[in-house]
Amino acid sequence: MTSAMVLTMVLCFALTISVAVSIGLASLVGIQVSNVNMLIAVKEMFSSINKFPLAAIPFFILAGNLMETGGISRRLVEFAKSLVGGVQGGLPMTCVLTCMIFAAVSGSSVATTFAIGTILIPALIKHGYPTTWAAALQASSAELGVIIPPSIPMILYGVSAEVSIGELFIAGFGPGLLIGGALMLFVFVWCRFKGWGKSDGEGRLPVGRATLQASWALMMPVIILGGIYGGIFTPTEASAVAVFYALLVGLLVYREIAFADLYTILKKSVISSAVIMFVIANAGLFAYLITRAGVPEMIGVWLKDVLHDGNTFLLGVNAALFVIGMFIETSAAIIVLAPILAPVAQFFGIDPVHFGMVMVVNLALGMITPPFGVNLFAACTVARISLDRIVTQLLPFVAVVLSCLMVITYVPSLSLFLRDLVYK
């Protein structure tokens, strides 16, 4: 059964069929081969998405779309530019910093790409940066949208591996700040080497004025994350608070959202949420079938026999996930692989929260690597260029994130320090 499912999925990928449909067709083959009752299959698909923590996904997506339409993202850009825009290469640094701030409320890298990219990619091009480099920068920076909490992949890992989502969220700050800081340092040095960005400080608002204009926007991550870690509400409840706050600010404070806009915003959010839920439902059925066949246990035993220590295990997992992330959508990969790999990681004495950070950061790289990197498609859409034109420009950014991944992998305290401080 397992061989037939894998062969079907590989064939579907070769035919460029979407990931969700490929996994669904592979599961259908598995059902036919193993004579599983179709009613059980439907039940498993429904059970995969009928989980309270997953309700946070559509809420965070809606909050991100409200922020984009309501002027919050534009004010965050001006605030970030006031802080770092005065140096040579300040505009690319503004891009990274804004993505870090926006990530603290959106939970999605694609939402971050569109919300920030529509503002900053044209600005970068106007200031003389190559279009291909601007798109590569935005795609890479937006990866922080799923690393800095709240994060949709962290929610999925928490549900799949039965790990506290609150602990995962707070553990994400260390890796997120490391990657954000490394990207900012890289673009600062690169722009000086290339002689780019000498006029980036033009039109920059004073810090005080920019902070005042963005004060309502800046309060959003404070309220959401402060509420979670202060024990006021759960991550799922926080997502609903994010929607309410973004709607309130967009309608009544900044007044950039009209009631007529709500239909378009809701429609866009529903479509994005449905795509993710469809992936989760199909991946959940796939995971059920391979678990029923005993595949996780077989893989676990094999890994324990072949790999003799945690460091070797992490190295092998990183290599495998990097390749898997290029071809399989992040959500599907986490749902299928987390229940298999997390118990093995615990066997080797690796904290499940730390392992979650390794998985999320590694698979997030798949969002900026060809051929199926969703951030690349989003950034290229905004920049109006083809995907093949930015591949070479991506290499330095991928190298920076890979270097950070190695630090995150082998320095667990980077992820666990804040978690231990708050939860233990």
Where are these regions (language model features)?
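Alpha-helical transmembrane segments of multi-pass membrane transport proteins
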Residues: 1-424
